[in-house]
């Protein structure tokens, strides 16, 4: 079976460990497992591909293939005392004592570097239990110190050790309005610099977009972090449907990348989910309503409006008892109506997949993954904030004090500016632009 090892780094609120734990809470229900990891499901479809994310331990108990990491003990204590306390393997929880103090350099070079070998031992042990490891997925935040600094260190080290395995990241980006840390632009830019080189696919999620969905669409006046994490876990559950249940398309991380990444550096995706309705207004939505909601910019979970750019590729994953014929018709309709938002020089750039098993508590749902040039809005915004601070050398001593060099900041800024330019270049490319088409044909990957 094609196993995936899940890593979650950084703490609290809407960061790696909380988002990761919400994901496990969602998928263990879908697969019919109880809080202790015993299978209580009714259908073989629930258990057929359990081994992708779960290892079978002795006495028929299933344990997540998960490694939980933080630089301070509080997060692990909270998970141990929570509803999934008995679910995770206790020796897969690795933590330091001091925290990263929202400093990327501490997570990447000092505190995190001291802990990383211990984490890699656990990762190796997990990899040895796999028959055919397809890759890794990591949940982390780019605004703090641990998720960003240590998260990217871990990605680089795992990449070094498993160079031919896939690396997917669920990265929570800082948002313009919901900011908790003054040095977020530094931490995020230094992280993106690493992700461009070391990740195969990065799903971008942003706090502000999640808050907006909770307030505007779900009518929650004061959304809690639990509400935000639940939204992210729904998207993660939708994205991984093809890996966990029988289906035709995007059946593993590599196929997902083949379908969505036309150029290796441009692997940053926006994601969306439907139905997003208040509990009171919930009704059975058909394919048409799901498609309409899913392509609504208000329901995209990152603060970039795809109408400001063009889709290079995108994928729609439907779940539940819905008609495949209707799905094809609706997607064709969306493309015809919004043809200006799709590049015309990548043929068949919209993929659809269908899985008959709906999420728990719903009859049908759809998940959207878009590789849109509009994602440059996020990088441009963070880059502008970075420049303002870096020109004044604000707070730089926090980083140089941990052994970092100013040159690293300059390189990270330059790499992110290049990324923005590349997205812009392919946004502007038209049918008559031979360069873009030739570049695409050269880069086009071959499926294994």
UniProtKB/Swiss-Prot annotation:
SUPFAM superfamilies: Tubulin C-terminal domain-like (SSF55307), Tubulin nucleotide-binding domain-like (SSF52490)
Primary location recorded for the protein, binned into one broad class: cytoplasm
Pfam families: Tubulin, Tubulin_C
Molecular-function annotations in GO: GTP binding; GTPase activity; metal ion binding; structural constituent of cytoskeleton
GO CC terms in record: cytoplasm; microtubule
UniProt subcellular location: Cytoplasm, Cytoskeleton
Residue positions binding GTP: 11, 72, 141, 145-147, 207, 229
Binding site for Mg(2+): 72
Keywords for this protein: Cytoplasm, Cytoskeleton, GTP-binding, Magnesium, Metal-binding, Microtubule, Nucleotide-binding
CDD domains linked: beta_tubulin (cd02187)
Membership in a protein family: Belongs to the tubulin family.
PANTHER family referenced in this protein's UniProt entry, alphabetically: TUBULIN (PTHR11588)
Protein name, UniProt field: Tubulin beta-1 chain
Species: Colletotrichum gloeosporioides (Anthracnose fungus)
